[in-house]
């Protein structure tokens, strides 16, 4: 079945319930409630253009120009519109005065370009009306002199003076648009004035009959003058009634009508027959028969000249048999083209009903339209502009309707079908969306198809819809059965009759076809007109934008729902029960001294503390730093937060909770031993400590490059911004803060809350070593010139340095700890290397268990990364010297291990094996330490 139209007709026989929009699930992650979103404002430019588009007279033009300029320009105080009166005088009627053409005004008129100034000079001011525009004006005000040009004569046809404020770029653009539309409105008013004859004085014909006879007026002339005096309506139907009644009386015809010719000369239409206004306009094609030749030849014809098809069409329209007919072309003086056919039917008198129309009747009709034709064509032109105005307003309303249904594609498509059918007066409308190489329709006039088995799918290169989708061009088919692409099998099976089709493409902002709309059977015409094509083209733009944005909105929503669902699942498994935090706080917060007497010394190893005691140790450190009291943090909330953070860590060999605890403890050591409060604000130190706790949340044991190479979900979310894992860690921290009962910053002011989150983001992102290497030169410069507490950049750099030193703090402990940490790190690295090999990629040497030589890798890491960091710390804080010395000591240990295994060789092919053998390496104090990765850590 290769035709879109047929399928859509077939599916209209079933009614389908509308699809219900999916209900959002999950919890939204947010920072703090913002100000309410701004309400949409009215489109003042569109309103201004619509008002200009409706102008039909001078008074309306002046008012529309004033309203339009007031709508788009700032602080408009005065608008004067001067129109050409005679050959050179430019006159304003409100108040009445003539435009002085001197000074700035003369300059603008001669240059024929808009001019702005800070007021008019004395030479410009000839009277009181312009006195308020005298220079100098206020600094924020100006006078605009806007000449409107008549392109035919090349002269200025009107001038507008505006007293307003200074313009922005957007207001300048709006003014240019208004100028163009004002000129179009002026031309339209001038054209209407030229075509409309002066009103005939309402005097008695009988009273002036003798005078007109003396002037040589005939009886026809007097009747025509009387008729013209009655043609004051702006409605073309009323004008036709008066003219046709006159023609019926003068030609003795039983019926008279006007067959109006469409702009494309493809059809005739009739709304009035004699004294009767038809309920619906009757239209029929002009491509066949003698009536079409009349439009081309401009010659009168009678009944005997018509074809049988012509006669049948006219008899169907009149509802009676034709005995006689006279058809006279009505020619426009402006275009010299036939605009209508005046027809008289069945002449009374004489041998009625066989009487024929005479040359005198032909003269009567021609004489009538010689005087009334311009009135009729002007009124028809006015009605057309009114129709265009209504269509523009309808399109604007359609756009509003479409853009309020972006949340559901099916509802949007249903709205598109309804609006398209109403705009074009079509019997049926179908919309197909392009899905790869198929056109898919699941929304029809009858409703929405929920079951995929009922949706229509056709190849994108078959049938009428396929042709439009392939070419991207609109297709108007007057006779469906005569078109080679139409498949009439569906019509034969359903009994439906497809007469004509208008099929148009729907494109996105990149001019790519994303769908096709198909209108079937014009209701009030023989086929779809050129006007319908233009309307469909304009309508398709709104359709394309709304569909593209709706599909994008759907994808974003689906991604958000998945994210919310994943977040809900994670939070469910991380949920802290009331018993857990109650048990943690049962005996109050333990003093730091009770944990270990050396807890606040750099020599203390936090990994020696049992993991079950680490949550209390976090609370103890926060209390010792006085953050709980200073920021009035609720203890149950803090306990829940700490337990949630602990549960937020996975269990890879190294990047687990014990690593986060060690990093947090080192931050505490820096605070206690280096007196950080003399360098940083309290909120910065607090943010540093919380960031240490959260800096590796939900770490998967793989680095950023692996996330990008494996095209993981995290990479899709964050790769464009860089620091994939670090951004994920921060997002997880925000998710925990947004969990009920875990927001430890809940009592912060909005300003402090935002600053705390900004600090956490920057500090956590600083754990990416790539970031550290980018700012290393800035850190060196800061150390050279000395730290300046009043320099905000120094604050940011110091926080980044402190975070990195905390993250690598295991290197500042004893050799046993350093050796154990190396084992954990390389187990994690080798696991990633194995995954990369399984993906078909070649891992880095440090992650390849078959190639990595750990001692050399550790020496390189300590020389190029760790030691420079702690050297900078020593330069800024002399008390941190012991940290640098201990890192240097551990580097010497690795040098000796490397030398030993260079001589003796590795114990086996596995690079981790040497850490599991009982080799001894002389410690720096002369004792011998077993090189055993499983030995207990010093406490």
From Swiss-Prot:
One Gene Ontology term from the biological process aspect of the record: negative regulation of adenylate cyclase-activating G protein-coupled receptor signaling pathway
Disulfide bond positions: none
InterPro entries reported for this sequence: GAF, GAF-like_dom_sf, HD/PDEase_dom, PDEase, PDEase_catalytic_dom, PDEase_catalytic_dom_sf, PDEase_CS
Keywords of this entry: cAMP, Cell membrane, cGMP, cGMP-binding, Cytoplasm, Hydrolase, Lipoprotein, Magnesium, Membrane, Metal-binding, Mitochondrion, Mitochondrion inner membrane, Mitochondrion outer membrane, Myristate, Nucleotide-binding, Palmitate, Phosphoprotein, Repeat, Zinc
Activity regulation information from UniProt: The 3',5'-cyclic-AMP phosphodiesterase activity is stimulated by 3',5'-cyclic GMP. Specifically inhibited by Bay 60-7550.
Covalent lipid sites (S-palmitoyl cysteine): 5, 11
One Gene Ontology cellular component: mitochondrial outer membrane
A Pfam cross-reference name: GAF
Catalytic residue list: 655
Gene Ontology MF terms: 3',5'-cGMP-stimulated cyclic-nucleotide phosphodiesterase activity; 3',5'-cyclic-AMP phosphodiesterase activity; 3',5'-cyclic-GMP phosphodiesterase activity; cAMP binding; cGMP binding; GAF domain binding; metal ion binding; protein homodimerization activity
Cofactor: how bound: Binds 2 divalent metal cations per subunit. Site 1 may preferentially bind zinc ions. Binds 2 divalent metal cations per subunit. Site 2 has a preference for magnesium ions.
Disordered, as annotated region: 16-38, 197-217
SUPFAM superfamilies from the UniProt entry: GAF domain-like, HD-domain/PDEase-like
Domain GAF: from-to ranges: 236-373, 408-547
EC code(s) of this entry: 3.1.4.17
Entry cofactors: Zn(2+); Mg(2+)
Binding site for 3',5'-cyclic GMP: 430, 445, 464, 487, 498
Residues anchoring lipid (N-myristoyl glycine): 2
Residue positions binding Zn(2+): 659, 695-696, 807
Domain notes: The GAF 1 domain functions as a dimerization domain.
SUBUNIT field: Homodimer.
Family designation: Belongs to the cyclic nucleotide phosphodiesterase family. PDE2 subfamily.
Protein name per UniProt: cGMP-dependent 3',5'-cyclic phosphodiesterase
